From Swiss-Prot:
An annotated Gene Ontology molecular function: GTPase activator activity
UniProt biased composition (Basic and acidic residues): 25-34, 92-114
Biological source species: Serratia proteamaculans (strain 568)
Protein name: Der GTPase-activating protein YihI
HAMAP family: GAP_YihI (MF_01058)
Amino acid sequence: MNQPSKAPRAPRSSAATPKNKKKSRAELDQEAREHKRAKKRRGLASGSRTQVESTNQKNKAAAQAKDPRIGSKVPVALVVEDKPKAKPQPKPKAEAKPKPRLTPEEELAKLENDERLDALLDRIDDGETLSAEDQKYVDQTLDRIDALMEQLGIELGDDDEEEEEKREDILKLLKGGNPKDVI
């Protein structure tokens, strides 16, 4: 039987494909020990509190040794003395421009058209309780509106109704003569 002939191959060179040399058992054991030793020594060295100071003081042999556990040596006043403290000087602001002052009419119109105030008043009408901050805002804004209306001479319609009722009561007293009927 004739077998086909094999083509001659080129000899392998060691530079083309390097062979992985298997490590012996002793070499593997040695590497494992080194790896284990490196893993064991993680973290900070013990006694670092004293070692840090000792490395700094190697240069200063004449300096006295300090114990890092002892705190500050700043003197503490045992008796309270009343000394007026100097107030820090406020830094001058770079030409703070005053806000343009609104006329009372403009300010009143602005406050009456305030969306936040309207929303808060709607919440009050719905029976909700407001936070302290919101209630303070409502009170301040309504007080300012009242002050502006007084300044401008604007009166609310509620006062007119009360005055009319008082006049009617007085007329009834004068005509009827008996003050107990009115009450």
